[in-house]
Amino acid sequence: MKSIKRIGLCISLLILIIFVTSCDGDNKITGDSKEEQIKKSFAKTLEMYPIKNLEDLYDKEGYRDGEFKKGDKGTWVIRSEMKIQLKGENLESRGVVLEINRNTRTAKGNYIVREVVEDSDGMTHNHTKRYPVKMENNKIIPLKQIVDEKVKKEIEEFKFFVQYGNFKELENYKDGEVTYNPEAPIYSAQYQLKNSDYNVEQLRKRYNIPTQKAPKLLLKGSGNLKGSSVGYKNIEFTFVENKGENIYFTDSVYFNPSEDKYNY
């Protein structure tokens, strides 16, 4: 009789475990599917690449949730930035952040030059210069007169990575280093690329990258894997990552409520 009761208890516990697991399945990522679900989450954004004409974003809808107010068409925020620190030198970054407002059909932002300097006490300080810009006819145009001819030329020739990047081969990236923290939630997948990779070749055409090392591609995001206007999704190509020596390129495309304020 006791044996029958024990068997019945075990069966009941087993049924309960199966029920709880199935109910919670949508919020959990199984070990075998982490990489695949992260790639699928990024694919929703990366499938847009390339957008050769950024003005197409005025008519392109993004992911919407309860954070958007009624009637708000949303704002696309795009950013591309190259960061280089050679041995014995300061870290310097150059890039553009652009807010493409679908309500007003205007696009404004900044060309940003930033230098990170370390003082004698080991404290770091950011020296940042911002040059206001706008987009018209798919071109980045300074809003103020620029004396520095180098900066002026960089702005005139600037292209966002989303305009020439291509991730059609994303599914072919295999055996990535995957991390996932469901409590934050934060997730990432990293892949070793070759210099023959299309996106690597495109970056080398546009930037003077002082190394022949092939980069690693890092897909890093936060928020709900299924989609959310709260959180971020960043792409990073890391060529060199050492103490006192860093070379990497970052890119991001967000779709957010227009009233959100952006710090850059």
Swiss-Prot record:
PROSITE patterns assigned to the protein according to its UniProt record, in alphabetical order: PROKAR_LIPOPROTEIN
> Lipidated positions for S-diacylglycerol cysteine?
23
Q: Could you tell me the membrane topology recorded for this protein?
A: Lipid-anchor
Assigned keywords, A-Z: Cell membrane, Lipoprotein, Membrane, Palmitate, Signal
Major localization listed first in the record, in broad terms? membrane
Which InterPro entries does the protein's record reference?
A: Csa, Csa_sf
- One of this protein's Pfam families, by short name? DUF576
Segment forming the signal sequence: 1-22
Q: Could you name the Gene Ontology cellular component terms for this entry?
A: plasma membrane
Q: Where in the cell is it found?
A: Cell membrane
Domain of life of the native organism = Bacteria
The lipid of kind N-palmitoyl cysteine is covalently joined to 23
The text of the family note is: Belongs to the staphylococcal tandem lipoprotein family.
Matching NCBIfam families: SA_tandem_lipo (TIGR01742)
| Name of the protein in question | Uncharacterized lipoprotein SAR0444
The source organism is Staphylococcus aureus (strain MRSA252)
